[in-house]
């Protein structure tokens, strides 16, 4: 299904289903004996969504012989990629709060449970922004399993295509205080101009000393749509409404590091391949890797 400017979704369809897939990957990485990450809430959230494919994937019960383009090696590569991504952003928040930041904004938060699982310092406020149905589902599900936030959690039930800066301000956000922003797994679902607008808005709300973390996929400019469709086809054969080729926005866009530097941030990046090496994880072979190619994880600090 082609994206539209006002399309909506739940956690079992479209962009929302990718959040559930990512959470399933975190649940599997949490069970990995290498212990790179610990997300105890990913599994109950995925089970509550109720998509059989992701539940079986999480439990290791998929019949991979019956799924086109699925092999144990490819599944493990996905889990490893999710592990290093999650670890990078977890460490980012620890570093930001160690530096004294006590305001956090998670954009398009999906099934992110960091407000519940990270050791936030006293006085930390975590703002989560996402579509109303997504926010409500996660809040209710985590309440049902007895989870309690480890920081003050404030939810902003609004799509990022709306006036989220105004909604954030209405929830008590203070732009005069340094903020740690996160835009994880988001940019590929934004048109190029919306990506720029997102960073413009963040910059307008960020005091010096604020930080931001995100990832950039250079291959989004000319990604292999046919390979992506082939991989998505295996999902659809098993009742999962994900067609990645139609969900992402391809084409030329500004490189995030260059764009942030131009806005007064000091940005730097590390490739996913480097993160695999850093954590002693085997780098996936090209045929088992993300069809969008290399991923650059970026962190930046507002300097002016």
UniProtKB/Swiss-Prot annotation:
InterPro entries xref list: Ppm1/Ppm2/Tcmp, SAM-dependent_MTases_sf, SAM_mthyl_Trfase_ML2640-like
A GO molecular function held by the record: methyltransferase activity
Gene3D superfamilies reported in the protein's UniProt record: Vaccinia Virus protein VP39
SUPFAM superfamilies, sorted: S-adenosyl-L-methionine-dependent methyltransferases
Pfam families: LCM (PF04072)
Chain residues that bind S-adenosyl-L-methionine: 130, 159-160
Keyword presence, Iron: no
Listed EC numbers: 2.1.1.-
Keyword Transferase among record annotations: yes
Gene Ontology annotations of biological process type: methylation
Superkingdom, natural source: Bacteria
Keyword list, A-Z: Methyltransferase, S-adenosyl-L-methionine, Transferase
Family indicated by similarity: Belongs to the UPF0677 family.
Record function comment: Exhibits S-adenosyl-L-methionine-dependent methyltransferase activity.
Alphabetized NCBIfam families for the sequence: mthyl_TIGR00027
Protein name in the entry: Putative S-adenosyl-L-methionine-dependent methyltransferase MAP_4189c
Species name: Mycolicibacterium paratuberculosis (strain ATCC BAA-968 / K-10) (Mycobacterium paratuberculosis)
């Amino acid at each position: 299904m082609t994206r539209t400017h006002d399309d909506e979704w739940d956690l079992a369809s479209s962009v929302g289903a990718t959040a559930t897939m990512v959470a399933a990957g975190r649940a599997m990485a949490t069970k990995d004996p290498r212990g790179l990450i610990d997300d105890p809430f990913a599994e109950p959230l995925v089970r509550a969504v109720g998509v059989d494919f992701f539940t079986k994937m999480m439990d290791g019960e998929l019949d991979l012989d019956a799924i086109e383009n699925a092999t144990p090696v490819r599944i493990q590569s996905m889990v490893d990629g999710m592990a290093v991504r999650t670890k990078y952003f977890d460490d980012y928040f620890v570093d930001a709060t160690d530096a004294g930041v006590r305001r956090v904004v998670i954009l398009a938060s999906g099934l992110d449970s960091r407000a519940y699982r990270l050791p936030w310092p006293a006085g930390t406020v975590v703002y989560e922004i996402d579509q109303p149905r997504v926010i409500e589902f996660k809040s209710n599900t985590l309440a049902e399993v007895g989870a309690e936030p480890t920081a003050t959690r404030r939810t902003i039930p609004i799509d990022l295509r709306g006036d989220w800066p105004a909604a954030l301000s209405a929830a008590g956000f203070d732009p005069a205080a340094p903020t740690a922003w996160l835009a994880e797994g988001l940019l590929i679902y934004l048109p190029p101009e919306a990506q720029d607008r997102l960073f413009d808005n963040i910059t307008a709300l960020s005091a010096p000393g604020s930080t931001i973390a995100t990832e950039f996929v250079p291959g989004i400019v000319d990604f292999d749509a046919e390979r992506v469709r082939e991989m998505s086809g295996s999902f659809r054969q098993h009742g999962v409404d994900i067609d990645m080729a139609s969900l992402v926005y391809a084409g030329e866009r500004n490189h995030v590091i260059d764009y942030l530097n131009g806005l007064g941030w000091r940005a730097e990046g590390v490739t996913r391949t480097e993160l695999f090496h850093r954590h002693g994880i085997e780098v996936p072979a090209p045929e088992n890797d993300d069809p969008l190619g290399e991923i650059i994880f970026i962190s930046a600090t507002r300097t002016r």
